[in-house]
């Protein structure tokens, strides 16, 4: 079953209430569509990054890592085409003077018509049919004007044209300008990739949908350099491989789809792009992009060779040929992935209570590799004989995993607190533990319980948290 917009709202509220996500600068009224990640949120982010890095970089012998600067020489963005063509068409409402992306509103209109059984080409939707989402005025729009999405900054003591720089709108260009450095120092040759995780910035005119579209965001990108005749094959490979990554980490396959960009909507560098989309259930278009896998051809290395004067071709000694490699780029949004994992994991079911009845419980059925907290140690009560020994066990386990200790409140309520943040295992230290030197370990999803010797708890978790 696909998530609904009400579940998205519920998950957003849970994220804020449990400290996964806070509005940035909240005590000053907040910044629109800017978010800070709290104690649990930062753990979840780091776990997603760790799984991506392991799958894309360290588990392979044909990919290496890189961490490039956020502020690159301005010439990089001139050469890449971003200064000239990294634009979105904006229209302004003549009544309230709010600006919106024309293509987003056309797509939303077409999606609404589709729900009525009417097929409409978004590009053919006349702006006279579109109602302003801010003031409700219909069809009163200016002609579209291009709006460059790069954020400017100035280096140096005064703001001059010479000091003009940009905050990177993508991490990819830092990889391309280091292509020759990596080939030389890492002794790599095509097919090989360079992976990078880092922040990017885009002056989105209509950010929104919680953490889905923001001006500051993190990307997990990899540029895979190949011999040109093999590009199509490698493109298919990375589409399938990246789709499977989400499924392996617990996303319901029914909530994922592949969307191939029409030729007329491809980016200036692309010969073909396929998006991995998740069915968030947004109003208008329920699908949202998690990751794009593009065949960037040899555009990037060729243009940087031309503008820098540095040869970025590759000489294949075995075949005595020289070529400019094509690039296959899987580019994922970290916080979009985080949002999808949360929405897909959110579940409401029932659990037995101490009175013999059942209570509603909220569970995040996150893959244990992603769960912010791996285990919680819960003494049956706050007792002088129980809490110190339970704390000692938590301290021991904390050497290997992120482990919480909680002795406040009824044990059932403490279970619920851990369930709704996705903790896979709760370890109860009770009065019997003082005699049999064992604890009860409860599994999150099935709520099954197992008695395990205290000396074996670490091994018990190690088997079940492998890969975390």
Curated annotation (Swiss-Prot):
Q: Which Gene3D superfamilies match?
A: Anticodon-binding domain, Bira Bifunctional Protein, Domain 2
Q: Where does substrate bind?
A: 101, 170, 217-221, 329-333
Q: Which GO terms describe its biological process?
A: glycyl-tRNA aminoacylation
Q: Where is it mainly found?
A: cytoplasm
| Record-listed E.C. numbers | 6.1.1.14
Q: List the disulfide bonds.
A: none
- The answer, when asked if Translocase is one of the entry's keywords, is no
Identify the residues that bind ATP.
202-204, 212-217, 289-290, 333-336
Q: What would you give as a GO molecular function for this chain, any one? A: protein dimerization activity
Keywords, A to Z, come to:
Aminoacyl-tRNA synthetase, ATP-binding, Cytoplasm, Ligase, Nucleotide-binding, Protein biosynthesis
Catalytic activity reported: tRNA(Gly) + glycine + ATP = glycyl-tRNA(Gly) + AMP + diphosphate
Q: Which Pfam families match?
A: HGTP_anticodon, tRNA-synt_2b
GO cellular component entries: cytoplasm
Residues annotated as signal peptide: none
Return the PROSITE patterns for the record. AA_TRNA_LIGASE_II
The record's InterPro entries line, in alphabetical order, gives: aa-tRNA-synt_IIb, aa-tRNA-synth_II, aa-tRNA-synth_II/BPL/LPL, Anticodon-bd, Anticodon-bd_dom_sf, Gly-tRNA_synthase/POLG2, Gly_tRNA_ligase_bac, GlyRS-like_core
Subcellular localization, per the record? Cytoplasm
Q: Which domain of life is it from?
A: Bacteria
Q: What protein family is recorded?
A: Belongs to the class-II aminoacyl-tRNA synthetase family.
Q: Which PANTHER family match?
A: DNA POLYMERASE SUBUNIT GAMMA-2, MITOCHONDRIAL (PTHR10745:SF8), GLYCYL-TRNA SYNTHETASE/DNA POLYMERASE SUBUNIT GAMMA-2 (PTHR10745)
Question: Subunit composition?
Answer: Homodimer.
Q: What role is this protein assigned?
A: Catalyzes the attachment of glycine to tRNA(Gly).
Listed name of the protein:
Glycine--tRNA ligase
From which organism does this entry originate?
Answer: Mycolicibacterium vanbaalenii (strain DSM 7251 / JCM 13017 / BCRC 16820 / KCTC 9966 / NRRL B-24157 / PYR-1) (Mycobacterium vanbaalenii)
């Amino acid at each position: 079953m696909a998530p609904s917009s009400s579940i998205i709202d519920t998950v957003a509220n849970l994220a804020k209430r449990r400290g996964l996500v806070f509005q940035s600068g909240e005590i000053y009224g907040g910044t629109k569509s800017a978010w800070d990640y709290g104690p649990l949120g930062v753990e979840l982010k780091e776990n997603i990054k760790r799984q991506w890095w392991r799958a894309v970089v360290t588990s392979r012998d044909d990919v290496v890592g890189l961490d490039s600067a956020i502020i690159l020489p301005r010439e990089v963005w001139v050469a890449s085409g971003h200064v000239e063509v990294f634009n979105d068409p904006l229209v302004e409402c003549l009544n309230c003077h709010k600006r919106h992306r024309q293509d987003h509103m056309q797509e939303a209109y077409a999606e609404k018509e589709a729900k009525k059984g009417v097929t409409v080409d978004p590009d053919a939707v006349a702006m006279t049919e579109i109602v302003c989402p801010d003031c409700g005025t219909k069809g009163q729009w200016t002609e579209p004007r291009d709006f460059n999405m790069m954020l400017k900054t100035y280096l140096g003591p005064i703001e001059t044209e010479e000091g003009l720089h940009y905050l990177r709108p993508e991490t990819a260009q830092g990889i391309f300008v280091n292509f020759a450095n990596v080939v030389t120092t890492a002794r790599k040759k095509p097919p090989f990739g360079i992976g990078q995780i880092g922040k990017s910035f885009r002056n989105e005119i209509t950010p929104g949908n919680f953490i889905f579209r923001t001006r500051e965001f993190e990307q997990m990108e990899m540029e895979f350099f190949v011999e040109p005749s093999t590009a199509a094959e490698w493109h298919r490979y990375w589409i399938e491989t990246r789709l499977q990554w989400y499924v392996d980490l617990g996303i319901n396959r029914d909530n994922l789809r592949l969307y191939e960009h029409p030729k007329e909507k491809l980016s200036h560098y692309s010969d073909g792009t396929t998006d991995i989309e998740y069915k968030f259930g947004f109003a208008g278009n329920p699908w949202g992009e998690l990751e794009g896998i593009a065949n960037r051809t040899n555009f990037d290395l060729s243009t940087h060779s031309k503008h820098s004067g540095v040869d970025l071709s590759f000489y294949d000694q075995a075949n005595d040929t020289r070529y400019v490699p094509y690039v296959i780029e899987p580019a994922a949004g970290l916080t979009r992935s985080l949002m999808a994992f949360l929405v897909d994991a959110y579940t409401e079911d029932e659990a037995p209570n101490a009175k013999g009845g059942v209570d509603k419980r909220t569970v995040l059925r996150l893959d244990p590799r992603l769960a912010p907290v791996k285990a919680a140690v819960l003494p049956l009560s706050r007792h002088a004989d129980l809490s110190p020994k339970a704390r000692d066990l938590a301290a021991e386990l904390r050497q290997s995993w992120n482990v919480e200790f909680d002795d406040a409140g009824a044990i059932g309520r403490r279970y619920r607190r851990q369930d709704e943040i996705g903790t896979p295992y709760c370890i109860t230290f009770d009065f019997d533990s003082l005699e049999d030197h064992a604890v009860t370990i409860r599994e999150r999803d099935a709520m099954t319980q197992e008695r395990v010797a205290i000396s074996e708890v670490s091994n018990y978790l190690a088997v079940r948290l492998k890969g975390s």
